[in-house]
């Protein structure tokens, strides 16, 4: 991902304020509610029968935290996202058979959640930088599919 120095600074500054537990669970939960077909990858998570059930599901929250932990690793290696996400790409492609479009959807949901949490601080410029990052992460995760 090519970010200007200003964009990198904006991404890093905001990410330092992110509560990974809270934002991760909310982002994954929203993905499962807004795009219900993504739930098929989470059969073992128990009750996903309603938006409330999804958003309060401890397994959704725990996996969301794990997902954002990996995203944090990516932010530390923006110049090598493909390498950073190679193993996760392989896992999601070969073993889990996740549609790579879901990575793009989750990235966009994450941007929405960040906008919700940070309000005016999440300026159009910050959003533009984050859109570049989530697109880069989605492409890296989809790399094994190509």
From Swiss-Prot:
Binding site for heme b: 63, 92
Modified residues (Phosphothreonine): 12
Classification via Pfam families: Globin
Keyword Acetylation listed: yes
Keywords associated with the record: Acetylation, Heme, Iron, Metal-binding, Oxygen transport, Phosphoprotein, S-nitrosylation, Transport
SUPFAM superfamilies: Globin-like
GO biological process: hydrogen peroxide catabolic process
Organs and tissues of expression: Red blood cells.
Gene3D superfamilies linked to this entry: Globins
Residue ranges occupied by any Globin domain in the UniProt entry: 2-146
Sequence positions bearing Phosphoserine: 44
Modified sites of kind N6-acetyllysine: 59, 82, 144
Sequence positions bearing S-nitrosocysteine: 93
Any one annotated GO CC term: hemoglobin complex
Chain positions found as N-acetylvaline: 1
InterPro entries in alphabetical order: Globin, Globin-like_sf, Globin/Proto, Hemoglobin_b, Hemoglobin_oxygen_transport
Any GO molecular function: metal ion binding
Subunit structure: Heterotetramer of two alpha chains and two beta chains.
Function according to Swiss-Prot or TrEMBL: Involved in oxygen transport from the lung to the various peripheral tissues.
Family per similarity comment: Belongs to the globin family.
Protein name: Hemoglobin subunit beta
Species this protein is from: Aotus trivirgatus
Encoding gene (name): HBB
């Amino acid at each position: 991902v090519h970010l200007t120095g200003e964009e990198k600074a904006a991404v890093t500054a905001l990410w330092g304020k992110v509560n990974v537990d809270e934002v991760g669970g909310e982002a994954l939960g929203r993905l499962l509610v807004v795009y219900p077909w993504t739930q098929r990858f989470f059969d073992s998570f128990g009750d996903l029968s309603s938006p409330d059930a999804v958003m309060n599901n401890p397994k959704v929250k725990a996996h969301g935290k794990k997902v954002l932990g990996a995203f944090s690793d990516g932010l530390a290696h923006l110049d090598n996202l493909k390498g950073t996400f190679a193993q996760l790409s392989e896992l999601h492609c070969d073993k889990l058979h996740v549609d790579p479009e879901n990575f793009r959807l989750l990235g966009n949901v994450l941007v929405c959640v960040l906008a919700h949490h940070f309000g005016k601080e999440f300026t159009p410029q910050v959003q533009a930088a984050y859109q570049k990052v989530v697109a880069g992460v989605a492409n890296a995760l989809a790399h094994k599919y190509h």
